[in-house]
Amino acid sequence: MKIHLSTLDPAQLETDALIVLAIDGGDKDNNKPQLQAKSDAFAKAAADLIASKEITGKLLEIATLHKPEGVKAKRLIVVGVGKAKSFTSYELRKAAGAAVRALKKSVKSAAIVAPENWGGAADPSTTSTLMFERGGLPEAVKAIAEGAVVANPDYNYYHSDRKTYELDELTILVPANGHANDLEAAMKEGHVIGESQNFTRDLVNEPGNRMTPTILGQRAKKMAEEVGIQCDVYSTDFLHEKKMGAFWSVSQGSEEPPALIVMKYEPAGAPQSPVLGLVGKGITFDTGGISIKPADGMEKMKYDMAGGAAMIGAMRAIALLKPNVRVIGVVCAAENMPSGKAQKPGDVQIAMSGKSIEIINTDAEGRLVLADGLHYAKQLGATHLIDAATLTGACMVALGGINAGVFANDEDYFNRFAEALKKSGEKMWRLPIDDDYKELIKSPIADIKNTGGRYGGAITAAMFLKEFVGETPWIHLDIAGVAWQEEAVPFLAKGPSGIAVRSIIELVQSFG
């Protein structure tokens, strides 16, 4: 999708579709929805829809007016953004996405009026100037670009009769306020982030026979060449050389070799510290190994590499946005398969750190590859770590399909990430990693075991990872419940969500 900015009068713009936002006026009869754009032409064109309550301004409600009087656009699309007091870039991103998905089967280009203020009445609860997290109109433009780009694709690539419906071009209409450079930069940033999230989604969507560890490494290397960062991909011999026994143990049952993907973004002039280490679980297909999963739903285990894909997508955006901070990306890719060579429950593996691990359940494999990945990122110089993984079904049970789980061992680092979350619009919820939980992963025959029993599974998995980060500030994202969109929603297709890409980018930018 191409995105442009324009300062033309929206009512005078000739376009297939013009998108205007509406604020929810409330439930009382006299609280009419307010169109975002201050225009007599829009007000007149939408008067009948407002009178008939086809437009209320409720979040994601969409009404269409064909051949609107006084407006040169062929159709006027009014999208609700909810109440003014709760309207942030989170709602705006959704609204832009919903408009794109509603239009993309019928038009190839559209325009949207960026919110500046609601104007008019004195009541700040209904007509307040929009207070976005990073300051007004630029944040709005960025959110529109992100939401529109992410909403555009559908994931039916392997239909033999596939028809592609995508919006080719979007114009964001902004006032001529003398801040053109800021708005252009915000638009480009949103476009890069949205495209990088879609890059991640493309990786996650591929079936296991078309996304092996080797292929994932090839895709990462190709991306790195395109954006100008270093990427090295290592396999079995390197894992043995580095004594990555935990990582190797997961891959040993598969005919497909593992891939350790190492990406480096090192801008000239960046300080030697901090160095951010992004570590992702890249299990390209997870049968569970000898502790095999039920057949029902196993096809979805192609997305068990969503954490690794998120790190690859984030590194793409980082390279293009060029923050002044060093970043290392480490993705541990493998298949978890049963065979005569596969690891067994009761085996003891030695991690790169030297810790011994009793294998209780071979389906608790993600934490094994991350254990070596986190330790290796530290060896490469990372001063701050963040990992992402579709790690536990327990996190899905606890938080459902709405929030990812967040764990952190450092309050300052977590607070920085919490601010990044607000800016990204991604939904995550912090869970505890108290030392009391450590008892649950103790083993009588090894330093630790790879599962902690029935209860608190997401927490005990995080406690396991904590054993491999030491005192390094670290954040763990358990994205198991939110990496895959089970059903389409107005602003997002069914399929991979690309979760964690935006928040990780915001975190990195906060350092540089």
Curated annotation (Swiss-Prot):
Its main location: cytoplasm. One of its GO terms (molecular function) is manganese ion binding. The active site is at K293, R367. One of its GO terms (cellular component) is cytoplasm. It comes from the Bacteria. Its cofactor is Mn(2+). Its EC number is 3.4.11.1, 3.4.11.10. CDD domains: Peptidase_M17. Pfam families: Peptidase_M17, Peptidase_M17_N. Mn(2+) 2 binds at K281, D286, D304, E365. Mn(2+) 1 binds at D286, D363, E365. This is Probable cytosol aminopeptidase. The gene is pepA.
